[in-house]
Swiss-Prot record:
Gene symbol of the encoding locus: rab11C
A single cellular component GO annotation: pathogen-containing vacuole
Entries under Pfam families matching the protein: Ras (PF00071)
Gene3D superfamilies tied to this protein: P-loop containing nucleotide triphosphate hydrolases
Record protein name field: Ras-related protein Rab-11C
Lineage of the species this protein comes from: Eukaryota, Amoebozoa, Evosea, Eumycetozoa, Dictyostelia
Length: 224
């Protein structure tokens, strides 16, 4: 039997932002092509993986959906380690979630690697009649902070794949232009190793307060 094709690059992406902006549905739409009308707030972390082709290379994205609720900030801080990309999500119908992008951006730049690539996503573009955040305002913010920007709808799939694929493509081009990176043995995180196939290390994930699986954890009330 032919061997299953291995990913040539494995990129860890963290999805952050306030609770109820739609992070879990963005993750599920991209990795599983699923959408749940009434999702509940993620406890701890959820993650999913998906492989795509970029320049004839197999790129696997390991996407982590971290809890956006304030009481989980201490938990999520550990998950920035090893991330080469980040998606900061706000809800276009919630001005406060957009204002809080600044806090998430500052936290990300404080805790993550210096050269992490960032995309800001304005989710729920299907709710145009309830919009509180003008597209031009968000675009200007993204440009002033030198980050990418797209508006998406996890409900109808608008720009979901495009947002992840653009971020992954930017990461790939950055990584492939550099010398090989070294695996951080202290954290056992898989990081890009230019042009070489990656094989999982033993126990690749850190200890979590909630068990990480590729499906949702036990959840509490509220929307994510």
């Amino acid at each position: 039997m032919p061997q299953e094709e291995e990913a040539e690059y494995l990129f860890k992406i963290v999805i952050i932002g306030d609770s109820a902006v739609g992070k879990s549905n963005l993750l599920n739409r991209f990795t599983r092509n699923e959408f749940t009308e009434k999702t509940k707030a993620t406890i701890g972390v959820d993650f999913g993986t998906k492989s795509i082709e970029i320049d004839n290379k197999t790129i696997t994205a390991q996407c982590w959906d971290t809890a956006g609720q304030e009481r989980f900030r201490a938990v999520t801080s550990g998950y920035y380690r090893g991330a080469v990309g980040a998606m900061i999500v706000y809800d276009i119908t919630s001005k406060i979630s957009f204002k809080n992008v600044t806090r998430w951006l500052n936290e990300l730049r404080e805790m993550a690697e210096q050269d992490i690539l960032i995309m800001m996503v304005g989710n729920k573009s299907d709710l145009e009649m309830s919009r509180e955040v003008p597209t031009k305002e968000a675009q200007a913010f993204a440009e002033s902070n030198k980050i990418s920007f797209l508006e998406t709808s996890a409900l109808n799939s608008t720009n979901v794949n495009q947002s992840f694929e653009r971020l992954l493509t930017d990461i790939y081009h950055l990584v492939s232009s550099k010398k090989p990176m070294v695996v951080d043995d202290t954290q056992n995180w898989l990081v890009p190793n230019q042009g070489k196939k990656l094989t999982p290390l033993s126990d690749p994930a850190p200890q979590l307060t909630a068990n990480t699986t590729s499906t949702h954890q036990e959840k509490k009330s509220g929307c994510c």
